[in-house]
Amino acid sequence: ERLAEILGRKEEEYGHPIYLISDEPYREIVFSGFQAPWIPHLYRDTIVCYSFSKSLSLPGERLGYVLVPGQAADSGEVYAAVAGAGRSLGYVNAPSLFQQVTSLCCDMTADLSVYERNCKLLVPALREMGYHVAEPGGAFYLFPRSLEPDDLAFSERAKQFDLLLVPGSGFGAPGHFRLAYCVQTEMIQRALPKFQALADSYRLSLIHI
């Protein structure tokens, strides 16, 4: 609501619409009973981008939509621009049969409770090992601090313990790493001793200095 208030004032100040793009593929994957707000109800000039790849657990499938609400300023022109960009930029469509199947289950979700279960298993365990990690309110990623300033070197070292981590530098946050927990809980349980061994290797390095 605060952001909507600021954008509304700025629209009046600059004399033209300011569009807010709400990227929402994770809107169903929220924890502790939280419900994500529907942004167009809060701010008129909102464009919503959505993908079914997360809610239906279809990684890699490009199935979704861009919503331009009729209430948005110049909505007809914005819609035409979005449709034109889709045709001109070039991309590979999902097979038509798959599109038809998805349309029949787009109001459903996969079992999303596994993500919250994995998160609640990982976060306290990693903290106890010495990792600094904020608990997310949804989705299926953690973004802890790496155990050394060089997150690239840290991620490379993690491979020695069969851990595949994504350096935070690729997301504009050096000194961190991204960890996905959209896997079976058993895999999380098997990974915990490896994270412990990785943390212990840094402690041993300090002892030997």
Model segments located where?
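PLP-dependent class I/II
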Residues: 1-206
